[in-house]
Amino acid sequence: MSRRMSLTALALLLAPAACSTYVEDRASEAWAPVYPVEEAERLDSLPTGGIYSSTSRGLFVSDRRAARVGDIVTVDFDEKFSASKSQSASGSRKSDYAIDLPDALTLGLDDGVLDNSTDQGFSGKGAASQSNSLRGRMSVSVTRVLPGGNLEIMGQKLLTLNNGNEYVRLKGVVRPEDIGPDNVVTSDRIAHAEIKYIGAGDTADTANAGWLRRGLSVVSPL
């Protein structure tokens, strides 16, 4: 019985070790590629011997930019943000007062003058700064053509390095005219962009505090 309890406790302790990998693997399911729906072969798509076909882009069409569900478009990441903030405040206050008391109250023991002074001061400063950058390229798929003609894109890239995984995920909306002739769009032209760079595995877990330490830090009064 005690051995079974020991094994159960060990399993509970080891379970969080693979938590990040499990969570990100499950999250990857929501970023699965979207493929165009295969429609039944229509009469107007059958070969007729003519050069022009309304269902094909043709051999002589030079514009190969993404335009339909399932098409691939390359995103050029050029993200760089920086922000800084500083604040300072100071204040001072000084007051003096004197009261001339009647001799009847002081019994003639002093000059009858009661004086006092206060001097207060405060000074505080604060500063904060943050910067980040992301550069690189990845290809994503068109998942939906919106009524206005804009394209909803989504995709992810998985990199496995040693004992860890790196996920690069992107979701957003682009205008067809913002896609260059080389079928590349820069990340700053993506509306409602959701860019994620997430690490999972042993390397990422070592950079985070364990679940026990996080729990103790919540309840600790120090």
From Swiss-Prot:
It is found in: Cell outer membrane; Bacterial flagellum basal body. A lipid is attached at residue 19 (N-palmitoyl cysteine). It comes from the Bacteria. InterPro entries: Flag_Lring. GO terms for biological process: bacterial-type flagellum-dependent cell motility. Keywords: Bacterial flagellum, Cell outer membrane, Lipoprotein, Membrane, Palmitate, Signal. Belongs to the FlgH family. PANTHER family: FLAGELLAR L-RING PROTEIN. Assembles around the rod to form the L-ring and probably protects the motor/basal body from shearing forces during rotation. This is Flagellar L-ring protein. It comes from Cereibacter sphaeroides (Rhodobacter sphaeroides).
